[in-house]
UniProtKB/Swiss-Prot annotation:
Residues 1-246 are annotated as: Cobalt-factor III C(17)-methyltransferase. Keywords: Cobalamin biosynthesis, Isomerase, Methyltransferase, Multifunctional enzyme, S-adenosyl-L-methionine, Transferase. The lineage of its organism: Archaea, Methanobacteriati, Methanobacteriota, Archaeoglobi, Archaeoglobales. This is Cobalamin biosynthesis protein CbiHC. It comes from the Archaea. Residues 247-446 are annotated as: Cobalt-precorrin-8 methylmutase. In the N-terminal section; belongs to the precorrin methyltransferase family. One of its GO terms (molecular function) is cobalt-precorrin-8 methylmutase activity. One of its GO terms (biological process) is methylation.
Amino acid sequence: MLLLPSRGKLYVVGIGPGKEELMTLKAKRAIEEADYIVGYQTYVDRISHLIEGKKVVTTPMRKELDRVKIALELAKEHVVALISGGDPSIYGILPLVIEYAVEKKVDVEIEAIPGVTAASAASSLLGSAISGDFAVVSLSDLLVPWSVVEKRLLYALSGDFVVAIYNPSSRRRKENFRKAMEIVRRFRGDAWVGVVRNAGREGQQVEIRRVSEVDEVDMNTILIVGNSETKVVDGKMFTPRGYSNKYNIGEKRRAERMGASTKGGMEVARRSEEILRSFYPEEGLRGDIIRRCIATTGDVTIKDVIRFVGDTEEGVRALRDGCRIIADVHMVRAGLRRDAIVAVDFARGDDTRTASGIRNLAEMIEGSLVAIGNSPSAAFALCEVAEKHPPRFIVATPVGFVNAAESKEMVRKLPVPSVTTEGPRGGSGICAAIVNCLIEHADRPD
């Protein structure tokens, strides 16, 4: 059978959020050129003033395959514009068009026309919530199992991405939204969230809330979850890209002292340092670390169990070089003044979650600063991993009476500089205090 080439063409057109002013010129030209307009009724209604006199075919929600079949069939003889909200390739209809055309060997010219996404529209309305690396996650489990959605959200949050959340809730999926907010709260605390409803359309609503304040949302809402850098000032939500540091924009950052930066806080820190020096007067980085541990525990005798191996300044150099921090548990990460990857988030198998996570992060361990404040099993796993993938620096202070002392003794035998506690004493707070002291030294001007 002879297959004649198609005389038509299919445009898959992203019309943006809704308003004509946010539609690209190319999208308008494709709609103008088209003989047929095919689409979901809601999207077609948004461009009704642009399609007068054209043949229009609409289908209801969840009839995407029917729309694609109709559009491809018509495009064999006619110019067709298949309408998609936002951008057709981002949670739009374009992937289905391509997949169906390839699988069924449909001989039709297809051209995709990008559109302004809900994420970019919402970010602009909020201020500049998305400015650099970010992730986009849909909470809809109609096409993707919830277990996969949850895993993707976990990785996006653990990577400290700004996260744009599409399809946060519907009448049938309120539970997914609740679960997602619990995950966000676990990773980000009470972070800033931009809540934008009907971006670029009638009924537009723009709010900036804390995670704890986000309650009822619907399918017309997009959420933008800020990362560790995101700020809210004068009603604008923005995530700096680093220009302030590069070009000295704004006030010069005040040097921090024991985590304090305000005038009152600095005075308290100064007085605390005077008292701490009376307990332990040694100068330098090691003296600062021991004093920080005394301040954290309120126990002067903690100085007797802190152990240093190798060049402690290597931890400062590593942080100045921008090395990643890997912590065993969220409690350590919560106390740090820089972001960290948490081993338990990468756990698989029958081993303890921290040990499993450390092993699964083996290649990332190499060259990292590893902070273990809770789990002896994580310290044992680190010693195994370090043979092939040595970290650059280790802080290990797991606490307890089962294997804690033994695991730290193994860490001290590694050819890697480290700070540890001897015996059963330690804990996540001490671990975070030591790492923060290294961070403070790393942040000081040369």
